[in-house]
From Swiss-Prot:
Homotetramer; disulfide-linked. One of its GO terms (biological process) is negative regulation of memory T cell differentiation. One of its GO terms (cellular component) is extracellular region. Glycans are attached at N24, N172, N228, N256, N329. Residues 1-19 form the signal peptide. This is Fibroleukin. PANTHER family: FIBRINOGEN ALPHA CHAIN, FIBRINOGEN C-TERMINAL DOMAIN-CONTAINING PROTEIN. Disulfide bonds join C206-C235, C364-C377. It comes from Mus musculus (Mouse). Residues 71-157 form a coiled coil. Constitutively expressed in cytotoxic T-cells.
Length: 432
């Protein structure tokens, strides 16, 4: 049943009065006049037209406490409006894209544009050709890479073969040149013979002193090449028949072997104790005659072993004092030709300030604190630091990789050291 308009308004006024009363009670108002009469008034505001009459409802000021959650309603409404605008924009963009696609697909709605159809066909044909060319280009690149790999392999093989061939030829020529040089040095020039009819003997190495009757080990002067100055060497006249020219000696650690290129070139130390004779002098000695090399080693347990090589030659400084050794014999093991990657034969001389080794990531001479014919890096190094006992850390001491038990040390553990080491040479044809 529908209530008449005036009855509905009366109900609204009554509800408003009750709300005001509750508000006054809540605020603690005790004014009798406020409790006696309802401040809400309903009264006519004009003439009636039929069953419809205008009314005016007057309400006092009313404060209602709203929940806190309604405070963020305005922000939420703003976000909703923003999202609605974004959605409307996307819808419009999609509609535009669809219209453009329809225009390109069927302009004018009749599908009769033959020019654009032909153009599309040409574009597809060009794309097909581009894809085909790209595939062929990729195949060509793969083939080029394969050929480059084969070429590098062949290049390395050829370079190794050429290097071995050249080394063999150089070794043979060295023997011949040394032989001829030895013969020529014994034949004085005619001018020299006329000026000095009585000749003094030239001692090219310690074996010449031995042949002439000297049997005491010590320092002697030699002239391996009459075109260069004479110099002193230490001669071992006792070991294995005598006549040995000592190139290097380690006895007590009194000489520092962590030296630069210039020091190893000229030589250093004390001939009576520890020394390196000098690469220039070693070159002259090994150039004048075909030499053999003997290495004597002794550890701190009293074990003494030796290594003998039937050929020994050191090139000049221009060739970086390259080492040439022959076949091995002895008891200490062939540490100079330990393996493929640790082979000191045919290697250049390296010092901490001159990197000529085969190690790609650093300087072996700098890492092992010495000058030597390093490979990548070492299986032998007689110029390492002198340790008076076993040591830890980098294996930078005197080292001979084939010594009994020397490689049994655990990584980071103690490493063996040597009490004595000596390198000496003698002519291959020497007979005590």
């Amino acid at each position: 049943m529908r209530l008449p308009g005036w009855l509905w308004l009366s109900s609204a006024v009554l509800a408003a009065c009750r709300a005001v009363e509750e508000h006054n009670l809540t605020e603690g108002l005790e004014d009798a006049s406020a409790q006696a009469a309802c401040p809400a008034r309903l009264e006519g505001s004009g003439r009636c037209e039929g069953s419809q009459c205008p009314f005016q409802l007057t309400l006092p000021t009313l404060t209602i406490q709203l929940p806190r959650q309604l405070g963020s309603m305005e922000e939420v409404l703003k976000e909703v409006r923003t999202l609605k605008e974004a959605v409307d924009s996307l819808k419009k963009s999609c509609q535009d894209c669809k219209l453009q696609a329809d225009d390109h697909r069927d302009p004018g709605g009749n599908g009769g544009n033959g020019a654009e159809t032909a153009e599309d066909s040409r574009v597809q044909e060009l794309e097909s050709q581009v894809n085909k060319l790209s595939s062929e280009l990729k195949n060509a690149k793969d083939q080029i890479q394969g050929l480059q790999g084969r070429l590098e392999t062949l290049h390395l093989v050829n370079m190794n073969n050429i290097e071995n061939y050249v080394d063999n030829k150089v070794a043979n020529l060295t023997v011949v040149v040394n032989s001829l040089d030895g013969k020529c040095s014994k034949c004085p020039s005619q001018e020299h013979m006329q000026s000095q009819p009585v000749q003094h003997l030239i001692y090219k190495d310690c074996s010449d002193h031995y042949v002439l009757g000297r049997r005491s080990s010590g320092a002697y002067r030699v002239t391996p090449d009459h075109r260069n100055s004479s110099f002193e060497v230490y001669c071992d006249m006792e070991t294995m028949g005598g006549g040995w020219t000592v190139l290097q000696a380690r006895l007590d650690g009194s000489t520092n072997f962590t030296r630069e290129w210039k020091d190893y070139k000229a030589g250093f130390g004390n001939l009576e104790r520890e020394f390196w004779l000098g690469n220039d002098k070693i070159h002259l000695l090994t150039k004048s005659k075909e030499m053999i090399l003997r290495i004597d080693l002794e550890d701190f347990n009293g074990l003494t072993l030796y290594a003998l090589y039937d050929q020994f030659y050191v090139a000049n400084e221009f060739l970086k004092y390259r080492l040439h050794i022959g076949n091995y014999n002895g008891t200490a093991g062939d540490a100079l030709r330990f393996s493929r990657h640790y082979n000191h034969d045919l290697r250049f001389f390296t010092t901490p300030d001159r990197d000529n080794d085969r190690y790609p990531s650093g300087n072996c001479g700098l890492y092992y604190s010495s000058g030597w014919w390093f490979d990548s890096c070492l299986s032998a190094n007689l110029n390492g630091k002198y340790y008076h006992q076993k040591y830890k850390g980098v294996r930078n001491g005197i080292f001979w990789g084939t010594w009994p038990g020397i490689n049994q040390a655990q990584p980071g553990g103690y490493k063996s050291s040597f009490k004595q080491a000596k390198m000496m040479i003698r002519p291959k044809n020497f007979k005590p």
